């Protein structure tokens, strides 16, 4: 054994301690996944060596065949996994094995609940890789040397998973990494060739380089020389995406997803496609079953694994799919790109634009198929990724109609509040003569469901979509129509129901408006600069008044988003609409005292603002006027 120098003991990052605690206390019922995780890491290390060796062939140090070896020692109760990939320096080891250098760590830790089943899903999403070794081991040793560094710059890392680790410099002749697991009592089953072989075949058959185990050998007879150790490859060792679809089982696709996405759950859907002709490439795209922690961080790492002629080039190649598809995982293998392609080149290459367009359509087709054939599965997709898909119409004009068809909304058709109504379903239920798609945005389902803006629609039996996500008003600014039918915000402008209003209704509305001209003028004078206009409402049947938004004005949702982010909000004033048939409006019209008329007008205005989900500019004045009115009524 080589002499250790520069030995030091260091503490784990707090988040790592928490993870290790969960591991050591048997969070996983399926312990065998530790081997899948370690093999996946080893495969990544070999991929990185292949890529770096394109420009620095000396890193191959003689060009030994790239492979992963798994061995065991029953007597010592150890399992050893070794790769001849890129390896790690002392600094790499401290960084990668002592901390979690990943965005969203704090959010991830906040979400841990103590519920083992739930937490296993969360940890699965987060991806723990190396730390899974502590599921079966009470001590883990790592010996590594980075390719291209001298043999005396190897590193030895060791930990019992209790809060600290030791690291020392050692001699290591071969580049790459060797991990030795000292199995816990009760985990001896893993120091067995048959067991390890089955685990590798089950989880890692798709890994595109040989995974070797020692060949089973008959024990040497007494006096005979012990034969030299022979190794045999136990996996297919071919890139899964290069095989014909008909030869790949669903289970293989699922295991490959777990490898490429570092996820513990099966994907929701996948699409495997080979393109030949002007462009030649193969893609294997997956839609996950759950959202990652950093889904709403638009600057978080994303993208596909990029291979060029089956040689790994880069992780997180973001140029192949638009930002609103950042949840998609998978690989793309091109025959047309150069092996020395860079991220900067990817952003400017016309070949990439063509591939991006085709891959985007393929994902949308996959989602359409899921929505049509597996509606319950699509509900799960929408719950996890719907808000991100809503970014699509603004980013991807060419596919706007296709994306719109995948959107789901709550509506007045039921009281569940569930976002399950597609635009096609809405139009299929539309009233005869209805040529518009009506919607209302707001802060919450309860607020929009009970909004006075819906009264005339309920009376006439017209369905209205209820939009309550913060992104919705912004989304609708990019959707002008669907299937030839325009969108109408029922809280905006002067409501026109078109053919759904009879000529008699329209004539009656005009006569009432003319009859109430005097009241309109009095209200304008009383409300003054608070409003842009006062008019008789065509929307109301039960409430006395509402506030409408000007046709070109910014809606409440967008105003609140801008205010919250500290941005300047354009000035605008609401339109005050009143219901001439309401008793309160009748009393208001008959009020002789201008002071009392003014108080009542402002109370109605403030109540209309509250019912729209807005906050009052002067709550104290509202309370004062209301108390004054209550005192007068109680006398």
From Swiss-Prot:
The annotated region (C) lies at 561-635
Record flagged with keyword Membrane: no
Mention any Pfam family matching this sequence: HATPase_c_3
Species: Pseudomonas savastanoi pv. phaseolicola (strain 1448A / Race 6) (Pseudomonas syringae pv. phaseolicola (strain 1448A / Race 6))
Q: Which family does it belong to?
A: Belongs to the heat shock protein 90 family.
Highest taxon, organism lineage: Bacteria
**Where in or outside the cell is it found?**
Cytoplasm
Q: By its UniProt entry, which NCBIfam families does this protein fall under?
A: PRK05218.1 (NF003555)
Per UniProt, subunit arrangement is: Homodimer.
Q: What is this protein called?
A: Chaperone protein HtpG
- Relate the protein's function as given in its record: Molecular chaperone. Has ATPase activity.
Disulphide bonds annotated for this chain are none
Q: Where is this region: B?
A: 344-560
Q: Does the keyword Phosphoprotein apply?
A: no
- Which keywords does UniProt give here? ATP-binding, Chaperone, Cytoplasm, Nucleotide-binding, Stress response
Q: What is its main location?
A: cytoplasm
Q: Name one GO cellular component term.
A: cytoplasm
């Amino acid at each position: 054994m080589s002499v250790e120098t520069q030995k030091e003991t260091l503490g784990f990052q707090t988040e790592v301690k928490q993870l290790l605690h969960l591991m050591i206390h048997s969070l996983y019922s399926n312990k065998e996944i530790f081997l899948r995780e370690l093999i996946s890491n080893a495969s990544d290390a070999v991929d990185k060596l292949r890529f770096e060796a394109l420009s620095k062939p000396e890193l191959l140090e003689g060009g030994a065949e790239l492979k992963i070896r798994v061995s065991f020692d029953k007597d010592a109760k150890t399992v050893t996994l070794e790769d001849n990939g890129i390896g790690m320096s002392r600094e790499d080891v401290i960084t990668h094995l002592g901390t979690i250098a990943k965005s969203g760590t704090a959010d991830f830790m906040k979400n841990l609940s103590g519920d083992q089943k739930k937490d296993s899903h969360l940890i699965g999403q987060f991806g723990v890789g190396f730390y899974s070794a502590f599921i079966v081991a009470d001590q883990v040793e790592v010996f590594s040397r980075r390719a291209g560094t001298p043999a005396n710059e190897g590193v030895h890392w060791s930990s019992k998973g209790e809060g600290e680790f030791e690291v020392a410099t050692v001699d290591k002749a071969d580049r790459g990494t060797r991990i030795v697991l000292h199995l816990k009592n009760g985990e001896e089953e893993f120091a067995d060739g048959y067991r390890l072989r089955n685990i590798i075949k089950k989880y890692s058959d798709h890994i595109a380089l040989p995974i070797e185990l020692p060949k089973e050998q008959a024990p040497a007879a007494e006096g005979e020389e012990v034969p030299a150790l022979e190794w045999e490859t136990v996996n297919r060792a071919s890139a899964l995406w290069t095989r014909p679809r008909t030869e790949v089982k669903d289970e293989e696709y699922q295991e490959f997803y777990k490898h490429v996405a570092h996820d513990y759950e099966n994907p929701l859907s996948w699409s495997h496609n080979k393109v030949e002709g002007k462009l030649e490439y193969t893609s294997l795209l997956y839609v996950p079953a759950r959202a990652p922690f950093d889904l709403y961080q638009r600057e978080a790492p994303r993208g596909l694994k990029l291979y060029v002629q089956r040689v790994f080039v880069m992780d997180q190649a973001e140029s192949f799919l638009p930002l609103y598809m950042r949840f998609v995982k998978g690989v793309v293998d091109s025959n047309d790109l150069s092996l020395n392609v860079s991220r900067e080149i990817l952003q400017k290459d016309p070949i990439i634009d063509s591939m991006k367009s085709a891959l985007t359509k393929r994902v949308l087709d996959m989602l359409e198929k899921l929505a049509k054939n597996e509606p319950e599965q699509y509900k799960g997709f929408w719950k996890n990724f719907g808000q991100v898909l809503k970014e699509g119409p603004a980013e991807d004009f060419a596919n706007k109609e296709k994306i719109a068809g995948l959107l789901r909304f709550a509506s007045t058709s039921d009281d569940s509040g569930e976002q399950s109504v597609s635009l096609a379903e809405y139009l299929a239920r539309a009233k005869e003569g209805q040529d518009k798609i009506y919607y209302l945005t707001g802060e919450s389902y309860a607020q929009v469901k009970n909004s006075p803006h819906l009264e005339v629609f309920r009376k006439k039996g017209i369905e209205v979509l209820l939009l309550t996500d913060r992104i919705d008003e912004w989304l609708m600014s990019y959707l002008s129509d669907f299937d030839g039918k325009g969108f109408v915000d029922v809280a905006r402008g002067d409501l026109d129901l078109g053919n759904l209003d009879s000529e008699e209704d329209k004539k009656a509305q005009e006569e009432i408006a003319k009859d109430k001209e005097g009241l309109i003028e009095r209200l304008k004078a009383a409300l003054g600069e608070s409003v842009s206009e006062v008019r008789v409402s065509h929307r109301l049947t039960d409430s006395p008044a509402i506030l409408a938004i000007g046709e070109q004005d910014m809606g409440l949702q967008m105003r609140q988003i801008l205010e919250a982010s500290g941005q300047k909000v354009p000035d605008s004033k609401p339109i005050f609409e009143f219901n001439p048939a309401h008793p309160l409006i009748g009393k208001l019209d008959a009020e002789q005292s201008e002071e009392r008329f003014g108080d009542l007008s402002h109370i109605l205005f403030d109540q209309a603002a509250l019912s729209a989900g807005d906050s009052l500019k002067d709550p104290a004045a509202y309370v004062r006027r209301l108390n004054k009115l209550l005192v007068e009524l109680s006398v």
